[in-house]
Amino acid sequence: MAIIHRATITPTMGELLDAWLDSQPWCPDGAVEMLGSYRFDDPAGQVGVEGLVARRSGRLLHVPLTYRDAPLEGGESFLISTMQHSALGERWVYDATGDPVGVRCFVRALRGEQEQAGMELWDGDTLVGRREPTARVYAEPSSPGIAPSAGVAVVAADGIELRLTRVIGTQLNGERQLVAEWADGRGVVAALA
């Protein structure tokens, strides 16, 4: 179960995302519209793993993130930003393609070994409710695709190849694919080759 705290976050997720997306060659300029998000549970309960679905200048984007309470050793090139979280303190936000915990969550989901997490909303030490995710993800057999392009991050892990889309709509090939559905859309966000 993913725990969501009622908190003030600085910089805001929108500010953090804008700054990082501005530096990405696969992302156009413009305002970011958040369409949905989903989470996975880290089995060790230490790292937050979240996938964001957004639109910027008409392009659908998939942004997989991890949240840590300390820097990821060797992960400097994947650090997106740090942020102050009023309930949890300083957090390090990473591109999940460079975080072993995030990569393993996606691999398990693609293999059918891990479902997306439910979300509990906490105010301090009090559980105040549950929140439905704004995007649903599920694994299914893959349909034929084409080779990865600039809109795809390719990660080699444990003898397999994980492909995470950056730009939703980019075709992927692989044995299994992870599909995200949100209020007005659907797209493949990952594949296992």
Predicted regions and their residues:
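N-terminal domain-onset segments
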Residues: 1-40, 77-79, 94, 102-103, ...
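Contiguous mid-protein beta-loop-alpha structural module that forms a pocket-lining wall or clamp
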Residues: 48, 57, 65-71
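Short beta-strand segments
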Residues: 5, 59-63
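Generic detector of ordered, mature protein regions
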Residues: 22, 30, 48-53, 73-78, ...
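Short, structured protein-protein interaction patches enriched in aromatics and acidic/basic residues
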Residues: 27-60, 126-134
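Internal, well-folded beta-alpha domain core
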Residues: 66-193
